[in-house]
Amino acid sequence: MKQLKSNAAILLVMAVIFAIPSCKKDDGMSMTEKNIDYPAAYVVNGESSTISVIKLSTNTVTDSIDLMNSSGSMIMWPHHIYHHQSGGDHHLAIGVPGMDLSAGHTGGMPGMKGMVVIMDAVTGAIKKNFELPVMNHNAVFSPDGTEIWTSQMDMSGKVLVYNATTYTLKNTITVGDEPAEVTFSADGTKAYVCNGMSNTVSVINPSTKAVIATINVESNPVGAWPASGGKMFVDNEDSRSISVIDVTTNANLGTIILNFKPGYAAFNATANELWVSDATNGKVAYYVDMGGNTWMKHGEIVTGADAHAIAFNGAYGYVTNQGANTVSVINVSTHAKVKDIPVGKKPNGIVFKL
């Protein structure tokens, strides 16, 4: 991620947009509560400031949730979304950088604040939204659901850890320059944050909050995406590559050269394939591990303009297309597109509630 630059004119416009009034509601209240009691995908529509709900049994949009803050204003430019289940409760965490990141991670402004939104995934009610000192990339629950982790995207990089019940700040962790996505390994033993200006990944012990390793990767890493088999896949925007990290040893196992700017990387264990979105060309490329940390490209799937996030549910993969305002449903076995689902404007993050 390149250094954030000042742009006073844009900041003024965004300040006006943030002030646009709408129907007021308080934290924990919803204009009309939903009853999403079925397996669903939740898609964040950045420009629309909504969540599209896709019923997985029919692959159709069955509901739309407006994102409103406690003062009754639209929550502008939500980004990524994560789910946590505790017993029968399902909650969603949404990171809100407050600006359009669909073209890349440049253009932020000093003084820009971020936000975290916590939502009940069944009713659609916003449980809490709270402002952050600096813009963030995402917000994610800790593996046990007791904490919410989020980054601060500036040169004095930090990860903030909040209590998921009281929403009070518990810990501030110093990481590299301009951290972006915060993620956890599949086994929950380590947290990762990609430092775009440092070209590193910070590895954090979730219990002690100590940085236990700093891993050098390629240019402008954005997210370290978890996979089964003890690996993390890091998408490096500027070097147009994927770095493969070993969770146990913290070693950088090697680099997959893509020759396109990656938007997201997701590993499908059943097919033993790594899917990487190619936003520029509206495709997803898929790679197979040939052994010895050697990955070979096996094909491409045409999805839609500005392909971005990828998520798997059984036999199907789901890809958000920011430029097409759709979600593509892909048959994992045949790599054939099943359908395109129209959603809101500039869809970005996607997550499942099963």
Label the predicted regions.
Residues 24-354:
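Predominantly soluble domains enriched in secretory-pathway, periplasmic, or organellar proteins
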Residues 19-22:
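C-terminal motif of bacterial Sec signal peptides marking the signal peptidase cleavage site
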